[in-house]
């Protein structure tokens, strides 16, 4: 979503508007509650049937009102219907005389965004990238259900979360909002999130369609990519997410793809999304991402946000003049109506309630514990032993006050005044306090970490030194490099030189380089951990929770190893020019299919930590591998089985990963993720696991036949604990 500067309304204006709100809202509610004969309120009818029935009763103006927003705080001057908004990202007028409610929208990447300015506070979950490290569809469902519930509690019935752009560009400032670099993992997790969001009777959203893989020049950039490459990478994540979650809306992105802006790109919106995938919901523009009226409507854009520059009076005039057929406008409006019925917002009107703060915090902490990745544990320095630990040095990262969060439209404000759109915000969840509570008898030292020499002196005094290091990222900007900011690499080097038992806890929105990795004993990746992150980290440091998370992205050794070693930027004179008629610079994604680990595999580049990597306080073994093709009736279905055993002394949960190497004739990267299983095991316990591999996950996009196909030949299947730790393998021929 676009950069939003949340402005304050002058007190006099606010009072005047408030006096207008009460009678207007009363009238609106009275109209909405009037119940003449409305056959479309029969819930036994399908959403399509109900939408068609309503559409036949609507006037031209009512149809136009459904296909654009009515504004949001801080975006232009107040509009005539501004008082009907809920203070969120925007809203769409309903049709009160027909019982169709308004759509009240809020950003909700990792919690309900539009809260603090209205005196409401939301649960801040760990970032989406963090939750992806759980590799757990059930955790994704829990995540979505909480957001859906809190949206309704605060008066919203549509979420603007559901980001699933792949980590094609690791320096992307919004990677923390997304689900990692693999389309099957990302699509599966976002689909489960959306499914459980919508189960709470809100309209789910998946975004940013498509290839909005960096923030730099996002309004001006044209992405150049082959049909096959985008179908098998970025678009596949959307396709899987839509097939699982059935979102009511797809948000088109700011950038252009192969020459046309995404929100007026017929190939993306109609040919692929609506035709090939059969998407029945509506396409909503990213905020300010609409560029035209006739072209955008013909391409398949259904709803302009947050205002009506192109889909208000201009669209009405185009319909009346015949430039836009009435049938086209009807399709836009029908899709909005269908999503309202399918999501249940018509039959289950929003009723505001007090947010269950304690319940939300418990969910946030649970997901944070499942999402924190143990990257290094030399000499089993972790978990820390309470009995022998007499002193601890806590250094850096504002660990005395909180843990950092991601910025932009995703930002969930903690209690207190609302923050600027791009601001460093620390949730008041203090690692220092959480760790002190674990060992109340130990001596605690704290140093802010602003001076490496001073921090080193503090570290010398303690049995163990824990450095909290952060990398703040935000919508609207990318990080210039993957190194830690604010001289933190030097800080860690100094502390590690002073204390041989140095542990680093990372709070980051994407991968970071670690020039100090050989000099520290332990590393935890906590990501943006939400408003109970400190408790989760403390539980893992002291072994109350056994880490089980694994990386959903690759951590490279350096920026030089990336497909694009230097971030592609627009020329300075072409930056931030607002809505354009055409893009002004290109990014050629010539790495094509080789996104994330597939790039490093294909190019034989060593990495710092591979995709799928994550340590535990216990150990696991894999054995008895078997792979078999399906029956004669379904020969492309493959079943993989193996035995997983917990060979350590602690209970734990292992994420077992299955990869496939396709025949050389397929022209694919060396291997791809095709399945996984998360299994909880007691010490010494074994379990036989069997995974059925979806043939779609073994397919390639064939441009000649315009479809997916399984290439005949020999397939190698591999199983293990990460993309570079695959002790089991077997082959099978597919025809």
Briefly describe each language-model feature range.
Residues 25-701, 707, 712-724:
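Glycoside hydrolase catalytic-domain context in secreted enzymes
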Residues 12-21:
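Bacterial N-terminal signal peptides
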Residues 1-6:
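N-terminal secretory signal peptides that target proteins for export/translocation
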Residues 725-735:
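Short beta-strand elements
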């Amino acid at each position: 979503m676009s950069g939003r500067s949340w402005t304050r309304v002058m007190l006099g204006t606010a009072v005047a508007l408030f006096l207008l709100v009460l009678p207007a809202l009363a009238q609106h509610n009275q109209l909405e509650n009037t119940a003449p004969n409305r056959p479309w309120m029969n819930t036994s009818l399908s959403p399509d049937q109900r939408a068609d029935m309503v559409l036949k009763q609507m006037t031209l103006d009512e149809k136009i009102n459904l296909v654009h927003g009515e504004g949001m705080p801080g975006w232009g001057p107040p509009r005539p219907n501004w008082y009907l908004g809920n203070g969120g990202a925007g809203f769409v007028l309903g049709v009160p005389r027909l019982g169709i409610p308004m759509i009240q929208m809020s950003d909700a990447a990792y919690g309900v965004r539009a809260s603090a300015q209205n005196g409401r506070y939301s649960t801040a979950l760990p970032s989406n990238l963090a939750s992806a490290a759980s590799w757990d569809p059930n955790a994704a469902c829990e995540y979505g259900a909480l957001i859906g519930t809190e949206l309704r509690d605060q008066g919203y019935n549509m979420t603007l979360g559901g980001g699933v752009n792949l980590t094609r560009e690791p320096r992307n400032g919004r990677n923390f909002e997304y689900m990692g670099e693999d389309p099957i993992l990302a699509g599966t997790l976002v689909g489960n999130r959306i499914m459980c969001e919508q189960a709470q009777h809100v309209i789910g959203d998946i975004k940013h369609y498509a290839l909005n893989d960096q923030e730099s020049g996002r309004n001006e950039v044209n992405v150049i990519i082959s049909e096959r490459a985008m179908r098998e990478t970025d678009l596949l994540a959307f396709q899987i997410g839509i097939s699982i979650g059935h979102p009511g809306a797809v948000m088109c992105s700011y950038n252009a793809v192969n020459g046309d802006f995404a929100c007026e790109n017929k190939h993306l919106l109609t040919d692929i999304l609506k035709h090939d995938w059969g998407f029945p919901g509506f396409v909503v523009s990213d905020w300010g991402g609409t560029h035209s009226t006739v072209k955008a409507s013909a391409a398949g854009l259904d709803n302009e946000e947050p205002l009506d520059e192109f889909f208000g009076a201009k669209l009405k005039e185009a319909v009346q003049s015949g430039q836009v057929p009435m049938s086209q406008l009807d399709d836009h409006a029908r899709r909005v109506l269908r999503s309202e019925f399918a999501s249940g917002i018509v039959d289950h009107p929003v009723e505001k309630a007090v947010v269950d703060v304690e319940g939300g915090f418990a969910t946030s902490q649970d997901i944070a514990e499942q999402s924190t990745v143990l990257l290094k544990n030399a000499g089993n320095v972790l978990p820390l032993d309470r009995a022998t630990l007499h002193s601890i040095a806590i250094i850096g990262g504002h660990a005395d006050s909180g843990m950092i969060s991601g910025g932009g439209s995703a930002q969930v404000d903690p209690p207190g005044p609302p923050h600027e759109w791009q601001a460093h915000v620390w949730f008041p969840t203090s690692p220092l306090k959480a760790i002190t509570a674990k060992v109340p008898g130990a001596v605690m030292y704290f140093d802010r970490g602003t001076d490496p020499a001073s921090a080193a002196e503090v570290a010398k005094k303690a049995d163990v030194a824990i450095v909290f290091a952060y990398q703040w990222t935000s919508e609207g900007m990318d990080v210039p490099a993957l190194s830690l900011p604010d001289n933190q690499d030097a800080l860690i080097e100094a502390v590690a030189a002073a204390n041989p038992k140095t542990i680093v806890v990372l709070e980051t929105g994407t991968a970071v380089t670690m020039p100090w990795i050989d000099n520290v004993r332990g590393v935890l990746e906590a990501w943006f951990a939400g408003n109970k992150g400190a408790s989760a980290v403390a539980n893992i440091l002291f072994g109350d929770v056994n880490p089980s998370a694994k990386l959903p992205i690759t951590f490279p050794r350096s920026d030089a190893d990336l497909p694009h070693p230097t971030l592609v930027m627009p020329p300075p004179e072409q930056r931030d020019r607002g809505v354009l008629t055409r893009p002004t610079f290109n990014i050629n994604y010539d790495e094509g299919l080789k996104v994330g680990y597939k790039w490093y595999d294909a190019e034989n580049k060593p990495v710092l930590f591979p995709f799928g990597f994550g340590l535990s306080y216990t150990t696991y073994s894999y054995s008895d591998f078997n792979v078999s093709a399906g029956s004669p009736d379904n020969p492309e279905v493959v079943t993989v089985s193996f035995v997983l055993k917990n060979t350590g002394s602690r209970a734990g949960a292992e994420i077992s990963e299955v990869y496939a190497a396709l025949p050389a004739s397929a022209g694919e990267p060396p291997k791809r993720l095709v399945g996984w299983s998360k299994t909880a095991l007691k010490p010494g316990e074994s379990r036989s696991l069997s995974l059925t591999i979806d043939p779609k996950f073994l397919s390639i996009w064939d441009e000649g036949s315009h479809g997916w196909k399984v290439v005949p030949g020999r397939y190698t299947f591999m199983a293990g604990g990460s993309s570079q730790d695959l002790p089991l393998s077997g082959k099978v021929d597919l025809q």
